[in-house]
Amino acid sequence: KIFFSLMMVQEKIAMENNLSETAFTVKEGERYRLRWFTPGGELELVGHATLACAYVIMNFLEKGKEHVSFDTLSGELTVQKYGDLYEMNFPAYELTPVEVTQEMTDAIGATPIEAYMGRDLLCVLQDEDTVKNLTPNLDKVIHLDGLLLQVTAKGSETDCVSRTFAPKMKVPEDPVCGSGHCHIAPYWIQKLQKDEIVAYQASPRGGTIYCKLDGDRVVMSGKAALYSIADIFVR
């Protein structure tokens, strides 16, 4: 618990890592407490860093464990392992339609056909190529409403494609955004009238997420891979 009082240290580690998110977790009883930091500060909900924590716990800290519960700023989050997939259960964001503005067009570099507000601004674009080829003006994106900018369109090989931009959190582009799909998945599941969708995040790194709804929750599944094991020296 003393570890989690060192918020300044966590922020500095996240800044030094300079990745979209750095996760900090500690075991408390049978559960884990989990917090996430970007180079620009703390977030209340993060997907792929949660999946990464579950991967480490299940494969290194508690080998053979197939279910992990996390206590977070967004309440209890769970991760269940099914083969090589890790299934996360997150709260869905309620989407409110908003007017498409010239400011959105100027910032994004394309005119949305629809726009919605949850925690983030969700902009639906004309087609997949527009999403993939987008070069937004991040100096203008930072002035749009919403914490992050989510852009999405119907996909050709998957149900939808998306990208996530987070200059307010000092993250130009998030490679794969789990919390973003708490906006994106509810939209496309309703739009396509499907029970489940396959979503592709079309960032330079890219990633596939399998999504379905469970009441007011989004159930997302994805894969994880070990990149490095390292020591951090705090002075």
Where in this protein do the model-derived segments appear?
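Active-site proximal loop and beta-alpha junction motif in alpha/beta enzyme cores
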Residues: 1-46, 51-235
